[in-house]
Amino acid sequence: MKTKLKVGDNVKILCGKDRGKTGEIVSIDRKNLKVVVKSCNMVKKVIKARTPQEKSKIIDKEAPVDISNVMLFSNGITSRVGIKFENKEKKRYLKKNGENV
């Protein structure tokens, strides 16, 4: 499915345990409609030792968030994203105030 969000956009989390937090999109899974937001939805992952000399580790990792639970965040405003044509180029803009992204 086509989305209007891109890697590097600042978004705000709308639902879940990290509601209200903002962060930058690290990756987008367009097939499963998930996004990974930097420093949001952190989970603990256990890395098993491969050899007897190594120790197991527990690391914090960002888990994906459903794309419907995030919204573009710019200048303190959350807004939906629209597309308009200027000089035969597609431009993304915030629908709430008309500002270009």
From Swiss-Prot:
GO terms for cellular component: ribonucleoprotein complex; ribosome. SUPFAM superfamilies: Translation proteins SH3-like domain. Keywords: Ribonucleoprotein, Ribosomal protein, RNA-binding, rRNA-binding. GO terms for biological process: translation. InterPro entries: KOW, Rib_uL2_dom2, Ribosomal_uL24, Ribosomal_uL24_CS, Ribosomal_uL24_KOW, Translation_prot_SH3-like_sf. Gene3D superfamilies: 2.30.30.30. Coiled coil: none annotated. It holds the Pfam family ribosomal_L24. One of its GO terms (molecular function) is rRNA binding. Transmembrane segments: none annotated. PROSITE patterns: RIBOSOMAL_L24. SMART domains: KOW (SM00739). It comes from the Bacteria. Part of the 50S ribosomal subunit. Belongs to the universal ribosomal protein uL24 family. One of two assembly initiator proteins, it binds directly to the 5'-end of the 23S rRNA, where it nucleates assembly of the 50S subunit. One of the proteins that surrounds the polypeptide exit tunnel on the outside of the subunit. PANTHER family: MITOCHONDRIAL RIBOSOMAL PROTEIN L24. This is Large ribosomal subunit protein uL24. It comes from Borrelia hermsii (strain HS1 / DAH).
